[in-house]
């Protein structure tokens, strides 16, 4: 299970720089191959795209025009929303459970600055091991993994192939 909750916020005015954020996105935004595999990944048809709010409506996230050129980058909040499903314009703050050690806002921002200077130091995209959530989580906690991917793998293992 996820060791965090997503808390809907009214907008960026309610978020401090260094906060991990997320927007709802469709699986079809990941790769066209996954469109045919919806039911294997989740009971739902979406995931949450994660990033770190910087300031002045800027977000650090792991993205690209396609997954091959995905890398740590900075965009404005509207571009970050466009990575979402296009219909839902809700913004969520990621709040980790108390058993997860969370870095300070300042330390998170230092990590963001460092990786944005040398984005090639971050490994390439891989749906399960290296995605937007694992990137944002690493910036916020120092841990490099994705709860969404772990849950999806669990669903594949226990879900019946035929309903």
Question: For each of these PLM feature ranges, what is it?
Answer:
Residues 1-163:
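Cysteine-nucleophile amide-bond enzymes
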């Amino acid at each position: 299970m996820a060791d965090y909750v997503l808390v809907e916020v009214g907008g960026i005015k309610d978020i401090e720089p260094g906060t991990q954020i997320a927007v709802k996105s469709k699986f079809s935004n990941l790769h066209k191959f996954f469109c045919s595999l919806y039911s294997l990944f989740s009971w739902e048809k979406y995931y949450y795209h994660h990033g770190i709010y910087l300031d002045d409506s800027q977000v650090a996230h792991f993205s690209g025009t396609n997954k091959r050129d995905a890398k740590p980058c900075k965009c404005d909040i509207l571009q970050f929303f466009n990575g979402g499903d296009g219909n839902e314009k809700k913004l969520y703050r990621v709040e980790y459970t108390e058993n997860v050690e969370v870095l300070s806002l300042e330390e998170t921002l230092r990590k963001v600055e460092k990786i944005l200077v040398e984005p090639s130091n971050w490994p390439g995209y891989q749906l399960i091991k290296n995605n937007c959530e694992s990137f944002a989580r690493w910036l916020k906690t120092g841990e490099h993994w994705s709860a969404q991917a772990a849950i999806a793998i669990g669903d594949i293992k226990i879900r019946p192939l035929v309903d």
